[in-house]
Amino acid sequence: GQEVNGSTWALAMMNMFLHGFDNAVIRWGDTLRNPKLKVDDKLMKFDTVVANPPFSLDKWGAEEAISDSYNRFWRGIPPKSKGDWAFISHMLEVADDNEGRVGVIIPHGVLFRGGSEGRIRQYILENEHLLEAVIGLPANLFYGTGIPAAIAIFRKGRTSQNVLFIDASREFENGKNQNKLRPQDIEHVVSVYQKFVDSKFAPGVVEEKYAFVATPDDIRGNDFNLNIPRYVDTYEEEAEIDISAVQKEIEQLEAELAEVQVKMKEYLKQLGY
């Protein structure tokens, strides 16, 4: 792997050592400006590529990307103030060309923003069909940010062009500082995803208010917008209000208020007011 933050890099190295991975190769450096995992000056290829890059990184190196010697940004140059698709582009280029898989944590804006990001997203969806799944996560799950995030999964060499959408944002355990996914929440996501990979789902609703399999026509009909609520119905009906019960509660509160006011007047009278 590669990590630009020195402290994080040192922690990662220590973590690998403590878990017995003495031969782990983790380089210290800027992945976008100076990728270091190379063989004969060519980017190394990997079966699986995973990352939790900084959300919408500003000044990520758009100017240098124009003349990138590894041609990682051939689909387009993302905005200089939002590096999300730059990281995704790098990850796709270092994934094995035959069966490489990419899993990346992203802010939801990556799924629907327009401009150059929208064009990159459309190209991948319309011409490469690499996107396999989008999984919406609960809010306040990651240290340092309370905004909800999602996982985007890409796969090289896939035969299906359908995309699985999962809204897992409501299945979690509340924490004091951060929310967390329980084992059953993770199992739910994995189970649905694995069945999709095994071609056990037809297009359409897989599980009410949780999962949907979208066809290329579905996605095209949404102008290549991948916002999860466009596919998974997240609408929750409001509970019916019992007007008579509410009226009785109001009358009871008014009676209690009148009683308190009478007592206050008596107390004030005793105090000479």
Sequence positions of predicted segments:
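Conserved SAM-binding loop
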Residues: 1
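S-adenosyl-L-methionine
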Residues: 4-43
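A conserved structural/catalytic subdomain of Rossmann-like adenosyl-cofactor enzymes
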Residues: 43-273
